[in-house]
């Protein structure tokens, strides 16, 4: 029987990881033993389901467990000598990871598995990118013309790219900044890692949207932060709560909330700025998917409304161009620019200057604006097609939360069903999506599917939805899905 110590300094997920690992290595949990579902294990131990998911993920990643499509999580077969060796190493007291390393290794991840059809959220239509233009711009700078492009210069970004980003943000998002305030980094996760290093101390309170971006959760937790949920509901963000402890940092995605797609109203933006000032807290504004608003007028970024210099703005080109470009940016208050420069230099979180030079031309010569307009039209049309297909073929099992922006939609189940169960069944049909429950870290998770549509053409969309339909039918025939419709769960935004 597994017993966890609630008074110990070791996090619950780490205790559970160590105990399950020890049981496997000792042979008490034998190969081909099926582990309880995450919800059942959580109820038996009196912990959150995310604690169990985090533990299972860590053991899956290290090869102690294996996931079998449609049948759950099982103990993997380990070579006998490996078990003996690992046991002896453990008894000898081998060096272990640091506390920070343990936190990082144990963080949950949004698993993606190679598959035939992937409803990946936030994935752009790469085939529509003007690669011939991009190749020409790269070739322009690939010829040796200036030593600065091939050395360790400009660690916070190519000057022309910083200027182009600053001008674009001023014109399109109302962001007020000089080029010197723009820090160019290796994508969103690099930005989050730098922000966590620079702004958060061990034990600091951070308000985090729930449901919210798992990458931000992981970066803050790895820095030793204590996450306090900032609930996102149908009528907006739950900002006022006197029982919520004073934060050091507040993380929000106000332009297209991840994953629900809500838009934070102007009055809530102003209220959040007041809250940040009252608590002397940093506000990290991830302007996720702000470029893809299909209806209504865009709301300016919070950074441009900030009068006290506490909003740090971040964005990425992964969603507007292509993911492997790995170029993102942070806009920091002027007084932080020099400190961020030193951290970026020391961590190596800066992308290729050759790519930056080509991107600067891509923006300044108008190709970026043209591509955005084209993608906005394409994604708006794909959203209409996707919603219509879901309503036509999947209405017996789910409803779609429509919104006016973004590259994905949230589907809610009309019957009692765990999204991880559907996820495993969908894998068996060659389809992948992101379960909604993985985006919760504190409250009982809502069940649903985050379905990306932007990077999928209508023909593939139909195939994927038919495969999802087959997954639902398979669950019905196996008895895993009740035939009666359940009361709809809270719909969020």
Swiss-Prot record:
Residues covered by the HTH gntR-type domain: 10-78
Gene3D superfamilies tied to this protein: Type I PLP-dependent aspartate aminotransferase-like (Major domain), Winged helix-like DNA-binding domain superfamily/Winged helix DNA-binding domain
Source organism superkingdom: Bacteria
PROSITE patterns listed in its UniProt record: HTH_GNTR
InterPro entries per the UniProt record, alphabetical: Aminotransferase_I/II_large (IPR004839), HTH_trans_reg/aminotransferase (IPR051446), PyrdxlP-dep_Trfase (IPR015424), PyrdxlP-dep_Trfase_major (IPR015421), Tscrpt_reg_HTH_GntR (IPR000524), WH-like_DNA-bd_sf (IPR036388), WH_DNA-bd_sf (IPR036390)
GO molecular function terms attached to this record: DNA binding; DNA-binding transcription factor activity; pyridoxal phosphate binding; transaminase activity
DNA-binding region(s), residue ranges: 38-57
Function: Could play a regulatory role in the transcription of the moc genes for rhizopine catabolism. Could also have an aminotransferase activity.
Protein name as annotated: Probable rhizopine catabolism regulatory protein MocR
Organism: Rhizobium meliloti (Ensifer meliloti)
